[in-house]
């Protein structure tokens, strides 16, 4: 009611209004206070704390770690020469007041930091490694030119030789398996195309772009160009992958209930077909055409053989598929 109150010298624990209110409530009796329950969610399930983007990043980190990759955290600033190797290094990404000459530009890719870390490890005698990093990359000076990527590198041998077999060098199919695994765990569409034509730091003819249509790229995998490895003093076979997290569409909120099971009246069968086509025809063209011929009954089309030479003649190849 506005009455003044003084604190005795032997009560140094009372520092403010909240402490005074607590003392009054204790003297009067806490049982006389009316309890007010906290508001509860009507669905009895707490709302998620992480956003969809944060949850996707967390899932991709865990997926890469489960595949045996060690996470790196590097600076977003790199030197001009390294930036130019990956398509950057122009005035739009240059810092006005850089920390040093080695941190003068915003990174256009995550590979410079990963390769620098790999080079330092190789200088100390560690030649087999699997590293990944998740972070922003910058393709210009405007806010819309920033996107989040997940990149990883495999270097050296897959495993040490033992009584069960010899070791082997890492190859493109190792990272192809890894990137497809991560994409499936973060909810990317399972139907995609693998095309060519990535940036110049990828080895020509030894890489692939995972696309949703001909223009929307969600991932790249393959061997890194030898000139890139030479610039960072990397020894041994090196393959890598990049996932463009911002390009992956967010899955729609679908109903959790499943439709009733409907048994098919047709028996499951497999048939093999071989087609003679031009040497430059992509296998995905054949599989897409085969899948589209009878979408209601065809569940899967996969390539199992390719033959070039023999009686086919120049500029021809045979592609065999299983339907």
Predicted region positions:
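A carboxyl-terminal module marker
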Residues: 4, 13, 145, 151, ...
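Short capping/connector residues at structural and topological boundaries
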Residues: 19, 38-41, 82-83, 98-100, ...
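Hydrophobic alpha-helix feature that most strongly marks membrane-spanning transmembrane helices
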Residues: 26-29, 65, 69, 77, ...
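Extended, well-folded interaction surfaces typified by the phenylalanyl-tRNA synthetase beta subunit core
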Residues: 1-132
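Mobile "lid/hinge" segments at catalytic clefts and subdomain interfaces of large enzymes
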Residues: 121, 125, 130, 137-148
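Hydrophobic/anchoring residues in structured secondary elements
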Residues: 38, 74, 136-139, 194, ...
């Amino acid at each position: 009611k506005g009455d003044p109150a003084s604190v005795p010298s032997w009560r140094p624990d009372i520092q403010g209004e909240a402490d005074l209110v607590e003392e009054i409530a204790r003297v009067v009796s806490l049982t006389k206070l009316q309890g007010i329950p906290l508001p509860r969610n009507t669905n009895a399930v707490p709302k998620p704390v992480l956003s969809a983007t944060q949850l996707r990043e967390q899932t991709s980190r865990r997926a890469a770690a489960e595949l045996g990759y060690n996470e790196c955290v590097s600076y977003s600033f790199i030197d001009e020469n390294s930036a130019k190797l990956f398509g950057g290094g122009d005035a739009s990404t240059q810092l006005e007041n850089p920390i040093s000459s080695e941190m003068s530009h915003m990174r256009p890719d995550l590979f410079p930091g990963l390769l620098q870390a790999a080079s330092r490890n190789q200088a100390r005698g560690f030649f087999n490694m699997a590293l990944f990093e998740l972070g922003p990359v910058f393709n210009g000076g405007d806010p819309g030119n920033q996107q989040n990527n997940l990149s990883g590198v495999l270097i050296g041998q897959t495993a040490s030789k033992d009584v069960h077999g010899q070791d082997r060098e890492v190859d493109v199919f190792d990272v192809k398996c890894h990137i497809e695994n991560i994409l499936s765990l973060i909810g990317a569409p399972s139907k995609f195309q693998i095309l060519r034509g990535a940036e110049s730091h990828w080895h020509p003819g030894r890489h692939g772009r995972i696309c949703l249509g001909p223009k929307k790229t969600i991932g790249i995998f393959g061997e890194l160009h030898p000139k890139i490895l030479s610039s960072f003093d990397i020894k041994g076979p090196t393959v890598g992958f990049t996932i463009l997290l911002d390009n992956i569409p967010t899955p729609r909120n679908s109903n959790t209930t499943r439709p009733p099971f409907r048994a098919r009246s047709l028996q499951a069968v497999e048939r093999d077909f071989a087609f003679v086509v031009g040497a430059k025809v992509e296998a995905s063209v054949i599989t897409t055409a085969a899948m589209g011929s009878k979408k209601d009954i065809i569940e899967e089309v996969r390539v199992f053989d390719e033959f070039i030479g023999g009686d086919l003649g120049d500029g021809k190849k045979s592609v065999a598929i299983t339907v």
